Amino acid sequence: MKKRFIMVTALLVASASAEAATVQEAFDAATAAYDGERWADAAAAFDALEARLAPHGRSAAIVRVRKGIALAHLGRPDEAALSLTKGLADLPAADATLAIDHYDGKMALGRADEATFQPLAAIAAFEQAEPLAPDALSRLEALSSAARVETYTDPAKALVAIDEALSLAQGKISDKKLEAQLHTIRGRALLNGSQFAAARKELDRAVDLLGGLTLKVGVTDLAARSDLAIAALLAGDNAAAKKYLAYAASGTLEDGFARGANMDPPDCGAATGLRPDDVAVIEFGIGADGTVAYAAPVYASRPGPAVVEFARAAAGWSWAPDRLAKIPSLFRAMTRIEMRCSEAPTRPTMQNSLDAEVRSWFAAQHLTLAAQSGVAATDLAAARRDLTARRAGAASAIALAPFLFEIATNRAAPDAERRAAAGEWSLATLQANPPPMIRAAAGLAASGAVATSSWRKGSGPSVTALKLLDDPAIADDTRTLNTLRIRFADQYLERRAYALAMPLIEAVIADSRLASADQLRSAALVRRSAIDLAGGNLPAARAAFEQSGLSEAQCALTDAQPAVTRHAGGTQDYPVEAIQWHISGWAMTEFDINADGTTSGVRATIAYPPFVFGQPTVKIFQRTKYTQTYRPAGGSGCSGFKASQGFRVL
């Protein structure tokens, strides 16, 4: 960071008291850390000093602004924004000695707002910083920062700001990398404004300023070449686009960019402001802990503030250590992905219900629960810390169970760690004499049925898991017993083992303890209907469906997920240019499965690299066939089904 710090030699009004001298010394020490860019030390020192000052005075304002700047550098934008907002509100505007604090504070606030997906607030902060800039380079920084955010919220406004920045830079900047960054921002503004030919020209200039299409690739080269590839793709020049992607090293990983543990797109609808036809390219980086360090939009088919919802979704993704290890450091630092919002309805699963019941039982036992942030890697790190602390404090086995449960069910944890945690939490829980449903959940975990990736589609229930049906405590509880029966039947149905699934389903239907309209009985009847249909017995399928009492819409949410009967992918689906340039990748889709096993409404929601494998994947799943389900009017057999397809050059 360029030093533009003006020392404030006396934080407080002159005083003879020893306390005042102590505060001044503390301020000087914090300032030394701040000036030396030791951000953690500076943030801690200013935080301690803030508590000793009057809340709304000049001194407190200076401390809060500088603490906020330090926090922003530490990647703690929420805390930074809070401190900066308070500090800037009380910072005297007419005090010339604080001019740099005003500028630096506004710039830091803009970056914090940008990082927390508040684009309009970020733009406002950058625009307020621009007239406060102490020199031409600082003004250039403010203009280009505002333009960078405006590229995806208001491309026309971004062009005005970046053109002013380029005019200011003309003849004054010899740094080609900085000049390339300015042309990249201008290119993105044109790209988001659908001026693809002009965008290509601008982005091509940025690439040339960085040395052209060489085999040397750094983060800056990666961004510029990727932008150029996107512009070429949107302009319809696929051959050139694939070449640029190859030089950006996008898709050159053997198996494509390793997918995260929970790569969910944002929902479409009023809550996000996103429409099904919206598409965005999001740039993000992954930290050493497997969490997303930053995420920001690069391109939006419909520019506006709502596009940050794509970036917000990406910020919640996580990578398990074994997956993260497959991603080279360059791509962990920065990669791009194509995204669309999800129209899939929330489909309840038995495992989600079991997990919720286990957590509720822990809470009812007055046990401290593991933190739930929604980010798998963050929750995993917190559970590990809490578990270590409680082991050191000789906590009881059951007190450790909630944290072990979090690790066992966290997709960012390595398989071996999940297995060990599952065995430990289940044993502790079983020893606490839990109610039948919790006993079943613990038994499943102990059997290895859900603790690791070994419980996968098509594997069927393990022998140990099936023995839970004979546990007297479970057998005596109607709901727990029949929940397990349907769960195990579904695992058989996934591999079309109808003969193994049918006895379990018939047992649910025959259980006289269930009411005729009970959801478990209805779910079993729907599954029997599908098995009868697969066996060619249409009258039996119709009768079972009618006995379920469910509508077609209810059925689509409660039925077992259909299994693939014919996967239609082949070499003909691999884009020719991608083969020529050895580009690998993948795409994730969602669609409905009709009662006859065909698909409809196939959409690519996430794809890597952008605009390469999304449409080929859509075509594959448009041809793929699934098991048939009985629906009287031929409606949807399964709504919001999700599937992915990988592409690999051998």
Regions found by a protein language model. Give the residues of each.
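…; additionally, a secondary subgroup of soluble metalloenzymes is captured
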Residues: 10
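Charge-biased low-complexity segments
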Residues: 21-44, 48-62, 66-81, 86-127, ...
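N-terminal signal peptide c-region/cleavage motif recognized by signal peptidases
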Residues: 13-18
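Bacterial N-terminal signal peptides that target proteins for export
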Residues: 1-7
